[in-house]
């Protein structure tokens, strides 16, 4: 039996679905969704924790046995992201950080130059860095070379629900990566999550697709099943695509 655990740096997780917390209507709805998802690792925007105290969310994650993964959401440059990561380390007593360095508010796309700069500084400072990046195989390689513990390419821009708009690039990132690849951003529904795993990703990170769904808990359960199905399909090996039909049973 193939080991189904997700291993990043020195930690292993039974679930390959990483959840975000943004967009949830309230903590009760979020709790139901987190339980249904089976996630063991959930992102927390450190700015929101600072601004709102964050005790309710952090207490919820602690009660559910879910590891919080602080992120630098909203940061617009390397210096700001590094400072936010350092604050997160002090506040949550963890050296894990989901690194986000955004170029602008309209697209929410990563700023490649500032992202690599921040990643290098944080790795040197002892962080386990998980960077949110563009679907660019070259940039993914640069981030891995900088010492990142995983690379997290987007499927499409944050919150768009467009799914994976450039699957070939995701496949190229997977083929060239020596660290786990986590599809991050753009997931709209369960089939998108399954496709990410079929393309070879090691995990999927999503938030909006669940927190803003009509029934967040039901969608979380669907996403969990989709990630598992996609992972198993990838391991099983799909049949090759053919131009012409081929009978499944030999002719008499």
From Swiss-Prot:
InterPro entries: Aldolase_TIM, Thiazole_synthase_ThiG, ThiG. GO terms for molecular function: thiazole synthase activity. It catalyses: [ThiS sulfur-carrier protein]-C-terminal-Gly-aminoethanethioate + 2-iminoacetate + 1-deoxy-D-xylulose 5-phosphate = [ThiS sulfur-carrier protein]-C-terminal Gly-Gly + 2-[(2R,5Z)-2-carboxy-4-methylthiazol-5(2H)-ylidene]ethyl phosphate + 2 H2O + H(+). GO terms for cellular component: cytoplasm. Its main location: cytoplasm. Pathway: Cofactor biosynthesis; thiamine diphosphate biosynthesis. GO terms for biological process: thiamine diphosphate biosynthetic process. Its EC number is 2.8.1.10. 1-deoxy-D-xylulose 5-phosphate binds at residues 159, 185-186, 207-208. It is found in: Cytoplasm. It is an enzyme of class 2 (transferase). Pfam families: ThiG (PF05690). The active site is at residue 98. Keywords: Cytoplasm, Schiff base, Thiamine biosynthesis, Transferase. Belongs to the ThiG family. Catalyzes the rearrangement of 1-deoxy-D-xylulose 5-phosphate (DXP) to produce the thiazole phosphate moiety of thiamine. Sulfur is provided by the thiocarboxylate moiety of the carrier protein ThiS. In vitro, sulfur can be provided by H(2)S. Homotetramer. Forms heterodimers with either ThiH or ThiS. This is Thiazole synthase. It comes from Mycobacterium avium (strain 104).
């Amino acid at each position: 039996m193939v080991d189904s655990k997700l291993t990043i740096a020195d930690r292993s997780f039974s679930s390959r679905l990483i959840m975000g917390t943004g967009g949830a209507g309230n903590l009760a709805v979020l709790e139901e969704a987190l339980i249904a998802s089976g996630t063991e690792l959930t992102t927390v925007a450190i700015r929101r924790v600072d601004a709102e105290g964050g005790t309710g969310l952090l207490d919820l994650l602690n009660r559910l046995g879910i590891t919080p993964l602080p992120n630098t959401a909203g940061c617009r440059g390397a210096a700001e992201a590094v400072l936010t990561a350092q604050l997160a380390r002090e506040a949550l007593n963890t050296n894990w950080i989901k690194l986000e360095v955004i170029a602008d508010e309209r697209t929410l796309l990563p700023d490649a130059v500032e992202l690599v700069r921040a990643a290098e500084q944080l790795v040197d400072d002892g962080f386990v860095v998980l960077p949110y990046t563009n679907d660019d195989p070259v940039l993914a390689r640069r981030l891995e070379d900088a010492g990142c513990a995983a690379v997290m390419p987007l499927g499409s821009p944050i919150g768009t629900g467009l799914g994976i708009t450039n699957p070939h690039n995701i496949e190229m990132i997977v083929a060239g990566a020596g660290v786990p690849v986590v599809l991050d951003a753009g997931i709209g529904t369960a089939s998108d999550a399954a496709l990410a795993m079929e393309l070879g990703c090691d995990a999927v990170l999503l938030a909006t697709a669940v927190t803003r769904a009509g029934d967040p808990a039901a969608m979380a359960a669907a996403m969990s099943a989709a990630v598992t199905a996609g992972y198993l399909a990838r391991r099983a090996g799909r049949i090759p695509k053919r131009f012409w039909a081929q009978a499944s049973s030999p002719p008499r």
